[in-house]
Amino acid sequence: MELHTVLIMLSLLPLLEAQNPEHAINIGDPITNETLSWLSGKWFLIAVADSDPDYRQEIQKVQTIFFYLTLNKINDTMELREYHTKDDHCVYNSNLLGFQRENGTLFKYEGEVENPSHLRVLEKHGAIMLFFDLKDEKKRGLSLSARRPDIPPELREVFQKAVTHVGMDESEIIFVDWKKDRCSEQEKKHLELEKETKKDPEESQA
């Protein structure tokens, strides 16, 4: 479930006319070095859609999520740093993401469990989207994230169409209300600490 909320990474799959969800989407564009560089940085979770009513109930408890992705080229992983606003309090988490370059699959590791999702990138809108468990009608889900918390109506409509094209209903979509964010101060403190940490080695060499 955690992967749904956070990976919130991303991407927009082509929307085709076929009615069968397995054929309606061409899942998994290859992940290149250029893709990984583009993904690096800050993202805002915009919306989540899920066919599991229990999961929708849980995700509604999480008011906002934004996250940072940092590429590690040495071992082909990405660091995921998440800021969740829940019950008007900020919760910070960090984790590692793995990926398969050939089929555009992302993995979040939770203990020994490997949770996959399928990634496509929509550079035109500065947005990314993840697709989960499309073959399972009871667990099927999508998430949309963007570089900015305020998205244009066009992108909102694209996400809504993506939801219906995989056999889900627009009523299963939950949009994030960014006025409820409570993590800006904690993020600021972390960024200041990172800045100071980068300064220290330089000062010691001076």
UniProtKB/Swiss-Prot annotation:
| Record's keyword annotation contains Cell membrane | no
GO biological process per UniProt: acute-phase response; regulation of immune system process
Kindly state which keywords UniProt assigns to this record, in alphabetical order.
Acute phase, Disulfide bond, Glycoprotein, Secreted, Signal, Transport
Region: Disordered, residue numbers: 187-206
Entry's Gene Ontology cellular component terms:
extracellular space
Please tell me whether the keyword Signal is annotated for this protein. Answer: yes
Enumerate the InterPro entries for this protein: A1A_glycop, Calycin, Lipocln_cytosolic_FA-bd_dom
Q: Where in the cell is it found?
A: Secreted
Q: Tell me which positions the record assigns to the signal sequence.
A: 1-18
Q: Which cysteines are joined by disulfide bonds?
A: C90-C183
Tell me which residues are glycosylated.
N33, N75, N103
Domain remarks: Contains a beta-barrel that binds various ligands in its interior.
Q: Which family does it belong to?
A: Belongs to the calycin superfamily. Lipocalin family.
Q: What does this protein do?
A: Functions as a transport protein in the blood stream. Binds various ligands in the interior of its beta-barrel domain. Appears to function in modulating the activity of the immune system during the acute-phase reaction.
What is the recorded name of this protein?
Answer: Alpha-1-acid glycoprotein 3
